[in-house]
Amino acid sequence: GVCGACHRMGTTTFALQLVKYLQLKGYKACYVEVNATGFVEQHERTFNTVHDTYLGKVTFENVEMYYKQEKLLDVLKQEYDYFVYDFGTYMDTDFSKTSFLEKDVRIFVVGSKASEMSYTNELIRNEYYTDVNYVFNFISEKEKPELLEYMEEKAAQTYFTVSTPDQFEYVPNEAFEKLLPVEDISEPEEEPRGFFRKKKGKKKRGK
């Protein structure tokens, strides 16, 4: 499960990148919206997508996204290896702490800007969340050592995002390998064949 410390933290982008990472590793993964942002439905109205109105599934750029929380039991019956849940933000009134903590992997997307730090600090100091991971978004290289020092004993659970201009285009990030160290079961891509056959060279006669 992925959750942001506050709004506009890049939580949804990070969740979608996790889906793309798992797909790259050869697994069937999907995105599940468990918040009130309406992101998935907005995508369906704006872009050329495939829409399953019964399950509330929108497919875009090879990512299957679900938005009907009342259909969650039906969604869980689908043949996926991984479900990536986007819980929106920690400050939302409908955020479910219990549901978030029940997930196998728990990730808080946090920030270091002045407008974000109070929310980030609240999460870090909250004893309710101990076995969770923290991912700082929009961080410069200069800030990273300072933030790791600031995180103290939680530094080992702290990671950083990389610049991701397009939510649906995977950008390699070593943090994913540590957060979800899964075996790569993807099949190697076949080398494209040329249109023409290579001519066999003539054997040279010895003198």
Feature-to-residue mapping (PLM):
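Hydrophobic positions on the alpha1 helix immediately C-terminal to the Walker A/P-loop
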Residues: 14
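NTP-binding/hydrolysis catalytic cores, primarily Walker-type P-loop NTPases
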Residues: 168-207
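Glycine-rich loops and low-complexity Gly/Arg-rich segments
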Residues: 25-27, 54-58, 108-110, 131-135, ...
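Active-site signature of alpha/beta-hydrolase-fold catalytic machinery across serine-
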Residues: 17, 21
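Generic hydrophobic alpha-helical segments
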Residues: 69-73, 120-123, 171-179
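Conserved catalytic-core segment of NTP-binding enzymes
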Residues: 78-82, 87-172
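Generic hydrophobic, helix-prone segments enriched in Leu/Val/Ile
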Residues: 43, 65, 147, 175-180
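P-loop/Walker-type NTP enzyme "switch/lid" segment
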Residues: 1-9, 24, 28-94, 98-102, ...
